[in-house]
């Protein structure tokens, strides 16, 4: 039952997700591709988290933040991808009203948390390169925990506030969401209430978070660039740049796609383009981040080799003892 009588109004009890395509063949192809991407996302991010936890060489603030970023990427992708995979195979792509609110709230929470963590990681690189002698004091365990906990609290408050403001609106039909998940714009289009206040509040909130985090990242890297250019050692410059390249790549990919969807005027792109870009930043980027941070990072590659070496050595000892 998609509608429920509520006084003088008919309230929506479930939504229909239009998805990416109606073509049955294309659905199978997309299901296979996105399933493979999701499996790589889960394995890659879990491996990053476990490697940082078990390797004492990686017990540094930078990797502490990276492990939380991996957790966020895992949660971000999982808030949307499993449901999208089910809808590729299902005939009736419905999601309950409560399910839609949970999906929207989860996606908002992890999206905002990613912004905060990327800003925190930029600040960490700034302190490491510009104030190396004070790094252990400025980025102590206590400070790192406070930064992460603050990011989680801020994201939770924002997600709760935005979700409540949207799902307090009246939805009385139609109930087709022209997207593959419960996103802000498609939901607002379905409301039969006055949406001016929720739209203004949500836009201000998103704009403020984006501006603050981008400002922190931009200022951090401006000081980093100035410091690196003053270095006389070519090796020192190369080492400093190499520690920042991965983070800058992740920042560019994430903020580039988010800006395309939430900052650019809606008249500049179609709904289908919006869907494609959404797939990129919610499904593809969480898969790419572990690769971006590990491929150019000698410490992570070294820790992985040591852990694999220990595993092989212990297994060979077991086989030797048995023989």
From Swiss-Prot:
Predominant place of localization: membrane
Record-stated family: Belongs to the G-protein coupled receptor 1 family.
Transmembrane region(s): 29-49, 58-78, 103-123, 137-157, 200-220, 241-261, 275-295
One GO MF term attached to the UniProt entry: G protein-coupled receptor activity
SUPFAM superfamilies recorded: Family A G protein-coupled receptor-like
Keyword entries, A-Z: Cell membrane, Disulfide bond, G-protein coupled receptor, Glycoprotein, Membrane, Olfaction, Receptor, Sensory transduction, Transducer, Transmembrane, Transmembrane helix
Positions glycosylated per UniProt: 8, 92, 268
Function: Potential odorant receptor.
Protein name as catalogued: Olfactory receptor 5P58
Gene3D superfamilies: Rhodopsin 7-helix transmembrane proteins (1.20.1070.10)
Organism (species): Mus musculus
Electron transport recorded as keyword: no
Membrane topology (Cytoplasmic): 50-57, 124-136, 221-240, 296-323
Membrane association type: Multi-pass membrane protein
Disulphide connectivity of cysteines: 100-192
Extracellular side of membrane: 1-28, 79-102, 158-199, 262-274
Compartments where found: Cell membrane
Gene Ontology CC annotations of this record: membrane; plasma membrane
One of the GO biological process terms: sensory perception of smell
